[in-house]
Amino acid sequence: MDNRPIGVMDSGLGGLSVVRVIQQKLPNEEVIFVGDQGHFPYGTKDQAEVRQLALSIGAFLLKHDVKMMVVACNTATAAALPALQAALPIPVIGVIEPGARAALAQDKKGPIGVIATTATTTAGAYPATIERLAPGTPVIAKATQPMVEIVEHGQTGTAKAQEVVSEQLMTFKEHPVKTLIMGCTHFPFLAPEISKAVGPTVALVDPAKETVATAKSWLEQHQAMGNHAHPNYHLYSTGNLPDLRAGVNKWLLSGHFDLGTAQIEEGD
């Protein structure tokens, strides 16, 4: 047993999709979450800058005595996962390989679609991972950066959201896929709009689910599961605290939430 919290980070509110799955699948675990809204978006930054920000957040989480770090951000996973794993004395889990594995479990032939930020798409993170896991599987990757802002600004469920999503996903009308990876943790909050745009026969893959399953497996293997009957969720924003509070109220399950601000700078 290990009652220390799980640390979770994202560039903004998207990581709450991972926290929500932790609430569902690991209900006795406490969480410390950092949404780096002060530096949002990561998806338009270069990899070196994202790496430094992620390392700073890792150091912040380590000071709060987390037992594990979940990088609930595809852009940060692509840019910083090996650096975080080398720098921190705790397990660090990203979202890209779990997402790729989940997609391949559903569709071994492809083509597999991927929607992600500009940075994740430019890095080629999903095609490279899928190629490593299942050589020769075709992948159609599309940068859909405007969809990230829709979620971050609380516009899910609106006509504006559907308009933006439908426009961004036109590629998959021309190049149909059976499986679509939501390769940004913001995108599960747009699942209804995405499904409407690509059609009900396309399976949507949320990497959060497989990522949390990976975390749970590690905790079980190392006898490190928590046993909090009523866990606390400590959520920090480096920017807009009211937006974080709105996201918590809209997307997370009920629980005891402590919200606050954190100062994160490159090289902290």
Curated annotation (Swiss-Prot):
Keywords assigned by UniProt, alphabetized: Cell shape, Cell wall biogenesis/degradation, Isomerase, Peptidoglycan synthesis
InterPro entries tied to this protein: Asp/Glu/hydantoin_racemase, Asp/Glu_race, Asp/Glu_racemase_AS_1, Asp/Glu_racemase_AS_2, Glu_race
One matching Pfam family: Asp_Glu_race
Enzyme category, top tier: isomerase
A GO biological-process term: regulation of cell shape
Protein origin, superkingdom: Bacteria
A GO term, aspect molecular function: glutamate racemase activity
UniProt catalytic activity: L-glutamate = D-glutamate
Active-site residue list: 73 (proton donor/acceptor), 184 (proton donor/acceptor)
Pathway: Cell wall biogenesis; peptidoglycan biosynthesis
Residues that coordinate or bind substrate: 10-11, 42-43, 74-75, 185-186
Known EC number: 5.1.1.3
Stated consequence of mutating residue 73 to S: Reduces racemase activity 1000-fold
Function (record text): Provides the (R)-glutamate required for cell wall biosynthesis.
HAMAP family in alphabetical order: Glu_racemase
Entry similarity comment: Belongs to the aspartate/glutamate racemases family.
Subunit structure: Monomer.
Protein name: Glutamate racemase
The organism of origin for this protein: Limosilactobacillus fermentum
Lineage: Bacteria, Bacillati, Bacillota, Bacilli, Lactobacillales
Gene name as annotated: murI
